[in-house]
Design a protein with these regions (language model features):
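Gly/Pro-enriched, hydrophobic low-complexity segments
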Residues: 150-257
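Extended lipid/amphipathic-ligand handling interfaces
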Residues: 72-76, 97-99, 187-191
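N-terminal leader/targeting segments and the immediate start of mature chains
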Residues: 18-69, 111, 234, 241, ...
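Beta-strand-dominated lipid-handling architectures at cellular/organellar boundaries
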Residues: 56, 67-73, 79, 185
Length: 257
């Protein structure tokens, strides 16, 4: 059973093209620029509020020792609900991760294996190295990493930066192109209606680098989502697995001797 589950996770790992070069960050001396905060507020109007969001996601890049390619169907609802389905070429999904903020389930339909009550961030960390909870992932994907406060700075004529605690949002020529968010480097591109359709996430981790690009399509925000969207029907006979089992299949796990 464990071998089958490992195969399901491995099905998400495949050769893919290298990620595109990221936009550079500004360098040099900064000047105070309170207007940068208002500029950011104006171009991220969809974030206030970002009550719900759905999108199809094509994920590519590298996680640890593995190249990654996956197709996901995603749904999010504030404050901490999510649904991620990793689609297979045919038949049932490779996996389904759901959480309503209180209860979290990871289900492998093909193997009928289930992990219950592990934190969302721990599950995503084991699968991809992206250790974010549902709320942080929603904000990161849709470019809502900074609120309405913060300190505005300007670098030269093109760059504006908004700092808010440990988060920095980078605007180039009035467009949100990057962010440093809770230790993650994020690059945004291909905006439509202010929402980025290409999101690159990078971080150097002790077990290897993470460099993933999420390409978003069919994006809808603030639509009504039924609470059932954040649950999954698990057959009574599904075999229970542990977070340690999942970590053993992680692309960041040490290779077997």
């Amino acid at each position: 059973m464990i071998a089958a589950r490992l195969a399901a996770v491995a099905a998400l790992m495949a050769a893919t093209a290298c990620a595109a070069r990221a936009p550079e960050r500004p360098v040099g001396a900064a000047a105070e620029a309170p207007d940068a905060v208002q500029t950011l507020i104006g171009i991220t109007a969809h974030c206030r509020p970002l009550r719900t969001a759905t999108a199809e996601i094509r994920l590519s890049g590298r996680a640890g020792r593995e190249r990654v390619r996956a197709r996901l169907v995603s749904g999010f609802a504030a404050p901490a609900s999510l649904r991620l389905e990793a689609l297979a070429p045919f038949g049932p999904p490779a996996l389904v991760l759901v959480s309503d903020g209180a209860n979290t389930t990871l289900f492998f339909p093909r193997e009928e294996q289930v992990l219950r009550e592990a934190p969302v961030a721990a599950v995503l960390d084991a699968l991809t190295g992206l250790a974010l909870d549902a709320s942080d992932l929603r904000r990161l994907l849709f470019g809502c990493v900074v609120g309405e406060g913060g300190r505005g700075l300007r670098y030269g004529s093109a760059w504006q930066v908004v700092e808010d605690g440990d988060t920095r949002a980078f605007l180039k020529n009035g467009v949100l192109v990057a962010a440093d968010y809770r230790g993650w480097q994020v690059d945004y591109a291909a905006h439509q209606g202010g929402i980025p359709r290409s999101v690159r996430v990078r971080r150097a981790l002790p077990a290897g680098a993470l460099d993933l690009v999420a390409t978003l399509a069919s994006v809808e925000i603030n639509v009504d989502l039924d609470a059932a969207a954040f649950t999954v029907a698990v057959p009574p006979g599904a075999a229970a697995i542990t977070l340690d089992d999942l970590r053993a299949a992680s692309p960041f796990a040490p290779p077997a001797p």
